Swiss-Prot record:
Function in brief: Tubulin-binding protein involved in microtubule formation.
A single cellular component GO annotation: microtubule
SUPFAM superfamilies: Thioredoxin-like
Tissue occurrence: Expressed in embryos, shoot meristems, leaf primordia, root meristems, floral meristems and young floral buds.
UniProt-listed InterPro entries: Thioredoxin-like_sf, Thioredoxin_domain
Species assigned in the record: Arabidopsis thaliana (Mouse-ear cress)
Protein name: Thioredoxin domain-containing protein PLP3A
Any one GO molecular function term: beta-tubulin binding
Keyword tRNA processing belongs to the record: no
Pfam families membership: Thioredoxin (PF00085)
Signal sequence segment: none
Subcellular location: Cytoplasm; Nucleus
Location of the Thioredoxin domain: 89-173
């Protein structure tokens, strides 16, 4: 199959899926407004097909679709910088890692410390949730220069960097209730309050997830087209 044709098909499928989602959202808004005004939405159904062909709807949602595409591109750019996963870095790479990203959460750990393993588990969960923040860890035994420079005395120690500057830190579990059974959400909320994570609205998460799924469906459809052509 012609590669350009595949790309065109993928783009059209993705756009169609997003527009379908937009139409469903618009339909919900219309029905909600009717209900608020005291009308009966059961007797005033909105035709989904008509909404899909409505140029006004396309205009209203064009900016949102473009914004979603920009967000996907932004996420890919972050991932190329090492965001989106919880990685171990060496002392030699440490300085470059914390200065190349605006927000960096770095866990100084010891491989034999039980509490460090607990912190590892939670940070590993948070890393893919918050792609705009970089999550890394450094073996304190193998990074004596920065352990001394940052005056790290207790492990686990999670140092919070903003634009290359250590702005704050979590020492042990002091900010987490001092017990070992704190939840990932507890840690997430602490990091949110300290400005290290960006809080997204639920509807933005839903829309982004739906857009990502539409892209995946389009890719699968494209692959099926390739198989059929064979």
């Amino acid at each position: 199959m012609d590669p350009d044709a595949v790309k065109s098909t993928l783009s059209n499928l993705a756009f169609g899926n997003v527009m379908a989602a937009a139409a469903r959202n618009y339909q919900k808004e219309v029905l909600a407004n009717e209900k608020a005004q005291g009308s009966n939405p059961v007797n005033e159904e909105v035709d989904l097909d008509e909404l899909m062909d409505d140029p006004e709807l396309e205009r209203l949602h064009a900016d949102r679709i473009a914004a979603l595409k920009r967000e996907v591109e932004k996420r890919e750019s972050f991932k190329r910088q090492g965001h989106g996963e919880y990685r171990e870095v060496s002392e030699g790479d440490f300085l470059g890692e914390v200065t190349r990203s605006e927000k960096v959460i770095c866990h100084f750990y010891h491989k034999e410390f039980y509490r460090c393993k607990i912190m590892d588990k939670h940070l590993k969960t948070l890393a893919p949730r918050h792609v705009d923040t970089k999550f890394i860890k450094v073996d304190a035994e193998n990074a004596p220069f920065f352990v001394t420079k940052l005056a790290i005395k207790t492990l686990p120690c999670v140092v919070l960097f903003s634009k290359g500057v250590a702005m704050d830190r979590l020492v042990g579990f002091q900010d987490l209730g001092t017990k070992d059974d704190f939840t990932t959400n507890k840690l997430e909320n602490v990091l949110l309050k300290k400005g290290m994570l960006s809080k997204k609205k639920k509807e933005e998460d839903d829309e982004d997830a739906e857009y990502q799924e539409s892209i995946r469906r389009s890719v699968r459809s494209s692959e099926n087209l390739d198989s059929d052509s064979d």
